[in-house]
Amino acid sequence: MAKRAKAPAKRRPAAAASAKVGELHTLLDFVRYAVSRFVEAKLAFAHGTSDPVAEAAFLVCEALHLHPDRFEMFATAQVTAAEARTILGLIERRVATRKPAAYLVNKIYMRGLPFYVDERVIVPRSFIGELLESHFGGEDGSLIEDPAAVESVLDLCTGSGCLAILTSRSFPNARIDAVELSKDALEVAARNVADYALENRI
């Protein structure tokens, strides 16, 4: 009985070669390249950004010391060779380590404000920040009639302290108790509280 010939093995698409300095020029070029690398590597997103485009833009902006909100303003600006090396290094680290981008740059943004994070805390991704603005601002539909009348707030499991800091802005006269079991996490929270000079309130 004749043997069946084996079907040829399917070839996997070749991995994309890493870009070199000088091949990419504008911020948009680097974002497009990063998105391709992230999708190829099947990275997960949910730690501060929800998709590869947002993650790529975040890393590019951080490498250039730009607030993410200003990306469109500089999208077509060209980068220097030194800046290109920094951006490419971050992109490759994100792919190689698979660590959340926030840990690579030690920063996360909530409600437009920057906060320090590292691996001692979970990357903040709570919707409470949005709720503070939409349901506790004192406007029509607010759950609290007068935010200025709130005297104390408890932030349980504060982690990086970012929600405690955001809460202090929503309730300007309140003392915030930021409670956390992890001593390491409290050190991160204390750093963020100090960055916003809120030691007397939190």
Language-model segments: residues:
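N-terminal auxiliary segments of SAM/dcSAM-dependent transferases
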Residues: A2, K6-M110
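SAM-dependent Rossmann-like transferase core, predominantly class I methyltransferases
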Residues: A75, R85-P172, I176-A194
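Conserved SAM-binding strand-loop segment of SAM-dependent methyltransferases
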Residues: A197-I202
